[in-house]
Amino acid sequence: MRLRTRFRMARFTLRSDIVDVPVRLFARSVRAETAALLEEPPGLLVDVLTGTGSVLPEYARRFPQARIVAVDLDSDILELARQRMCEAGFEGLELLADDARDMRLPACVADAVNISFGLHENNWTIRSLILGECCRILKPGGLLVVADYREARGIVRSAIFRLYLLLTEPRWVNEIFYGGLERQVEDAGFEVLKVRDDLPMTRLVLARKPDA
């Protein structure tokens, strides 16, 4: 495994361990709540910026007949996502090692697109390109699910969260707070249907690509 991949894996593991503590203590799984935003089974679900694919088993449990394609630029990280799915008892995950700004997928092909804790890793310009590409591959009326950080509430929590972000995340992560994520989703051509801010450290956004 390449050194770059090992570094990314270490960051994913550290971040997941930290985030999962409040989730396990105070709420049901953020991953399960993310998958639950889709009420109807998608024929094709594309998971963009997959990383290690922590949310994918939840989608597979909820929609066992769905075709799931995982997209990440790092093929080694994608293999870890496949391994995670296999360990959870799910086979058939399709891997696409590709740039999320220019995916080798046809236009209007996906019923749903998911992005979990990947957008904030990129600056505003790249996020806009990724969201535009997600809009391109979605069918008219298709759904976009985005899970990412939300701003902390309370003096103590905010201080701890700011320290966590300073140590683990890029400097532009604050751009997605206070409505920034939803505005950028809308700017990419989506209609925002639902926003959830009631989960630990997490904002969930459900959006729809308008009909042609």
Model-identified regions with their sequence ranges:
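A short acidic, Gly/Pro-enriched loop at the edge of an enzyme's catalytic core
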Residues: 101-113
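Conserved alpha-helix/loop element of class I SAM-dependent methyltransferases that forms part
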Residues: 25-42
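Conserved SAM-binding strand-loop segment of SAM-dependent methyltransferases
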Residues: 89-102
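A short glycine-rich, Lys/Arg-flanked "PGG" loop and its adjoining helix->strand segment in the class I
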Residues: 128-140
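Conserved SAM-binding loop of SAM-dependent methyltransferases across substrates and taxa
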Residues: 52-63
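C-terminal alpha-helical "lid/dimerization" subdomain adjacent to the S-adenosyl-L-methionine
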Residues: 55, 145-188, 192-204
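Conserved SAM-binding loop
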Residues: 81-82
